[in-house]
Amino acid sequence: MTAEGSYPHVARWVRDCGWIEIGHDDYSLSMVRALDIGGLIWEGKSRYATLEAALQDLDQALAKWFKAELRD
């Protein structure tokens, strides 16, 4: 399966809305984040058991964001 098939909301986000960041840095405690030109939209937990779990959490969060913000 493709990344777009596994994480359709992440794919839509990076195609149409903004970008994601994965990993730790000096500015955030979260492992995965979604951002747009206005800044941080969502940030996940500080740790996930797997990268798959982090991407699933991100995809679910973006699905909720699309529903709330764009009425999808």
Where are these regions (language model features)?
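Short N-terminal "domain-start" leader segments
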Residues: 1-29
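Mixed-charge, Lys/Arg-enriched low-complexity segments
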Residues: 1-2, 36-72
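Short, intrinsically disordered low-complexity segments
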Residues: 11-14, 32, 46, 70
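Short aromatic-glycine-(Arg/Gly/Cys) micro-motifs in beta-strand/loop hairpins
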Residues: 18-43, 61
